[in-house]
Amino acid sequence: SSLLNILIQIAIGLLKAIKMKVIISMSGVSHRFTIAGYNVPKYLIDVDGKKVIEHIVDLYPVDSDFVFIINDDCAKNPHIPAYLESLNIDKLTLCSVPVHKKGPVFSISEFEHHIEDDEQVVINYCDFSMDWDYYDFEEFVNTTDCDGCVVCYTGFHPHMLGGDNYAFCKTDDDNKILEIKEKEPFTNNKMLEFASTGTYYFKKGSYVKKYFKELIEKDINVNNEYYVSLVHNLLIEDGLTNLVYEVPHMLQWGTPLDLDMYNQWSDYYRKVIEGQKEIVLPNCVTALPMAGMGSRFSEVGYLLPKPCIQVNGHYMMDRALHCLPKTDKVILGALLKHKDLLPLRDYGEVVWIDEVLQGQACTTEKIV
């Protein structure tokens, strides 16, 4: 048993010495971004001080074997290939394909001669980033010896509030993928499903060649585009093992709305971390009406009045006041029956309301 473990570790070490082929497909025309006013390809848009492609490259070791696939229009612009070749990576094969709308599987199939049959291949889309540990992922696929793997996330992410859908995985209890749908969740609550980040792993380059060709020949598409996610269904049909590798956070920039939502959240958290510049409004009063019952919160088990519910270690009312400009005086309007529950001794002037009124406007009228 101990000898077997040693041999397994040696095998993993040898596999680590062989770098995965990382193919980044970015040959699309970014039509929605063009309509939204962007004048560069999606992968060259600035996000948090770096271009999208830089975020993607940073997901992998600098000595990875990269293949970038762009379209001919971008390739004809001398600044774009020059920029891509200047990135901090050791090995890059830059390819271009005529402009088309057939999806990433078609683009990658055009350059299968760059893929060795026995090498591991990761295919990465060009419009996101994520919180992950590449070396943990590498160890996961090598230890499990899976034939395919989809990097996924679950739970709340801001872009999940929008109407756009991505690829979703149906799994068993061991996170073995049973089926993948593109642009469509399996249930009415997509936040509980495994959603693909846009990173797809294949144990062998021969799988990429065989199943990408099969997907196109069988014309398995969504809106006339051939997606990498759907290739995994073909592997599954042939009895090959495909697993989910879960990451805690994913940053989606696939559409202008996704990017706008991300930037809003990013700006907010940056201000929280760095501290907002204090705004002072002289000759003004801040009125905080909080004399409601908070019935929706109590119905789901909250015992304290809503203003005192903790949000990231602070009272909800503190969070609200922190977002507001500093004024000469703060007046709180609170419900009298909550007097013993609300720690308002240090909050300046408090007006206690005898009964629940018809909304915040009525409460404000009482306290100012």
Where are the regions a protein language model picked out?
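Short acidic donor-binding/metal-coordinating loop in glycosyltransferase active sites
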Residues: 126-128
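Alpha-helical elements of Rossmann-like donor-binding domains used by nucleotide-donor carbohydrate transfer enzymes
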Residues: 109-110, 136, 230-231, 261, ...
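Conserved N-terminal catalytic core of the sugar/cofactor nucleotidyltransferase
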Residues: 7-10, 15-24, 32-39, 45-46, ...
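Conserved core of the sugar-phosphate nucleotidyltransferase
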Residues: 130-219, 340-342
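Serine residues within intrinsically disordered or low-complexity segments
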Residues: 1-2
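A structural signal for short hydrophobic beta-strand segments in well-ordered beta-sheet cores
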Residues: 44, 169-171, 244, 308
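Conserved alpha/beta core of the MobA/IspD/sugar-nucleotide pyrophosphorylase nucleotidyltransferase superfamily
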Residues: 22, 193-286
